[in-house]
From Swiss-Prot:
Superkingdom of this protein's organism: Bacteria
Function comment: Involved in a late step of protoheme IX synthesis.
A Pfam family reported for this protein in Swiss-Prot or TrEMBL: TPR_2
Spans of repeat TPR: 118-151, 328-361
Cytoplasmic topology ranges: 1-4, 63-398
Protein name as it appears in the record: Protein HemY
NCBIfam families cross-referenced by the UniProt entry: PRK10747.1, TPR_hemY_coli
Keywords assigned by UniProt, alphabetized: Cell inner membrane, Cell membrane, Membrane, Porphyrin biosynthesis, Repeat, TPR repeat, Transmembrane, Transmembrane helix
Cellular compartments per GO CC: plasma membrane
Length: 398
């Protein structure tokens, strides 16, 4: 606009001043090696004005041409973006249908023009993996990595997910270790870490992430408790595999008091020691647990114990009966322990006390065995009959 205004000013000046100097046009000589150009000052001014008009016209024409090209390019780019958006929407519908071949095709096609090309390539990689095409999955993943720039977390999460799908468990564990350094409370990273650590037996690492899982609300409390117990049992398995019962004892000794007072771990430790034929240590762990707090779970390994000092355990069981009252499982466990060293009369009394509180087919069978030893065949037969009737009642024929 300024240039046009200047041009009009010059033209007006020429119109006003021109007639004033019409009688005094002057003389201009432009001389070169081969040419001599002669004109008046007025003629030169007119030539310059015309040259400026021509230049402005050329500029205007070029601007229109380039503006048209830019509009054309914008139209083509917008068309590709609209197509990419439509294909992404179609791919999401195909994902809901489980048509992974179409998901990959639609997500990858025109992905560079999508609103979030990294997401398109990552979803295409997962769809290719679902089809078992690892080469295509890797290709899409690498393209996503190129476009992601510094925001590599989504790409690395997808990479770990693909590795787990391929059972490349140690590679996945390496990946989640690096991710946890960057984002230790990312819910999906924690879920993937859980899978990788379980598959590779990284039980200490699994224990380390459980507090972060609680803060990130990954899984409910019951699930996290199950994971914690699984991790501790995994560590027990490793200690037993390395050094047998001695390794188990040393490992247990090195744990914190809080850990050693967990009933579930006491039961698991006793069972591991029984499997190692270290019954005395297993019995001591059970006794220590019962003295601290009564829990039915501590009674479950007792029938498998084969110790040289069962009287100590039986004394503890009787004391528990006094402390917590008549409980059928306590009486039944005491009866089974008494049977191991021939205390048939005491065992029969214990089983009767258990059956008095609730019927149980196993207690009927054990009581019948004790009565046989006491030479009471008729009463033993009656107990077996009652046990059979209870079994049939609980498991009616189909």
């Amino acid at each position: 606009m300024l240039k046009v205004l200047l041009l009009f000013v010059l033209l007006i000046a020429g119109i006003v001043v021109g007639p004033m100097i019409a009688g005094h046009q002057g003389y201009v000589l432009i001389q070169t090696d081969n040419y001599n150009i002669e004109t008046s000052v007025t003629g030169l001014a007119i030539i310059l004005i015309l040259a400026m008009v021509v230049l402005f016209a050329i500029e205007w024409l070029l601007r229109r041409i380039f503006r048209t090209g830019a509009h054309t390019r914008g139209w083509f780019v917008g068309r590709k973006r609209r197509r990419a958006r439509k294909q992404t929407e179609q791919a999401l519908l195909k994902l809901a249908e489980g048509d992974y071949q179409q998901v990959e095709k639609l997500m990858a096609k025109n992905a560079d023009h999508a609103e979030q090309p990294v997401v398109n390539y990552l979803l295409a990689a997962e769809a290719a993996q679902q089809r078992g095409d690892e080469a295509r999955a890797n290709q899409h993943l690498e393209r996503a990595a190129e476009l992601a720039g510094n925001d590599t977390i989504p790409v690395e999460i997808t990479r770990v997910r693909l590795q787990l799908a391929r059972n490349e468990n140690h590679a996945a564990r390496h990946g989640v270790d690096k991710l946890l350094e960057v984002t230790p409370r990312h819910p999906e990273v924690l879920r993937l870490a859980e899978q990788a650590y379980i598959r590779t037996g990284a039980w200490s690492s699994l224990l380390d992430i459980i507090p972060s899982m609680a803060k990130a609300h990954v899984g409910d409390e019951e699930h996290r408790a199950m994971l914690e117990q699984q991790a501790w049992i995994g560590l027990m398995d490793q200690a037993r595999a390395d050094n047998g019962s001695e390794g188990l004892r040393n490992w247990w000794k090195n744990q914190s008091r809080k850990t050693r007072h967990q009933v579930a771990l006491q039961v698991a430790m006793a069972e591991h020691l029984i499997e190692c034929d270290d019954h005395d240590t297993a019995q001591q762990i059970i006794i220590d647990g019962l003295k601290r707090q009564y829990d039915d779970r501590l009674l479950l390994p007792i029938p498998r114990l084969k110790t040289n000092n069962p009287e100590q355990l039986e004394k503890v069981l009787r004391q528990q009966i006094k402390n917590v009252g008549d409980r059928p499982l306590l009486w039944s466990t005491l009866g089974q322990s008494l049977m191991k060293h021939g205390e048939w009369q005491e065992a029969s009394l214990a089983f009767r006390a258990a059956l008095k509180q609730r019927p149980d087919a196993y207690d009927y069978a054990w009581l019948a065995d004790a009565l046989d030893r006491l030479h009471k065949p008729e009463e033993a037969a009656a107990m077996r009959r009652d046990g059979l009737m209870l079994t049939l009642q609980n498991n009616p024929p189909q």
